[in-house]
């Protein structure tokens, strides 16, 4: 029995030593688990960021693709419209005689004028390209003068077309619905402001002689005065029209009041009839400004001026196309 005690004690000591090592091992295991959990959390954050970046890149590609598709659709629509206009011209919708044209405007109104303007603009662009080629080729003054005169005559044609269109629908012509949205922002009484056009040209045609600068300044001043007079006339017409329509508002529907109402409408209609006159005067001012500008400038300067005017209008139309085709977000 005595011999058994040491072995029993030794066994007990070994067991105690094993128990003393277990807390350290547990701590190491806990630390290892914590590191693994932390690494796993960091990996998840990284994966989430990568997923978010991929999603943002995907959405960016989709937006870019949609924008490109909208531009392509706009180009296709423009091509389709040009083809429809070409077919319409081949079918004889555009009438050459002024009497028949006026009758056509009465029947087709705004649509007929819009199609006429598209045809005019197509021919105008062709003539501008011809002028640009002549300028770049350093053509002589005689050749340039022939192209410049042709473009000036073409401007007279659109003024005549606007006059005919106004007889059918003066509101359509005045509002500029036949123009692109960006062009309408700068519209004045159905067209460009002569004074603003001269201001643009004076900075684009340098160098100019003192006599030319003086001539353009005087022309700009007289154009501005004429514009102010027409604008004031339009304001007076609007005020008078508003007062006429506001008369006896809210009155009962008796026979006398009905007759009064009809009388007011007749007066208002008569006043609206003067809108056509305002448009005609504004177009006359525009036409005279172009003619005076041609007299002040040399042939080569006149050619450059027509190119500047055309390029400015083209940029406004391009801006409208880009604006309408932008992503709608």
Swiss-Prot record:
It is found in: Nucleus. The keyword DNA-binding applies. One of its GO terms (molecular function) is DNA-binding transcription factor activity. Residues 1-48 are annotated as: Disordered. Its main location: nucleus. Residues 110-326 form the DOG1 domain. Residues 43-87 form the bZIP domain. Residues 33-46 have a biased composition (Basic and acidic residues). GO terms for biological process: defense response; DNA-templated transcription. Residues 71-85 are annotated as: Leucine-zipper. GO terms for cellular component: nucleus. Transcriptional regulator involved in defense response. PANTHER family: TRANSCRIPTION FACTOR TGA2-RELATED, TRANSCRIPTION FACTOR TGA9. Belongs to the bZIP family. Interacts with NPR1/NH1 and NPR3/NH3. This is Transcription factor TGA2.3. The gene is TGA2.3.
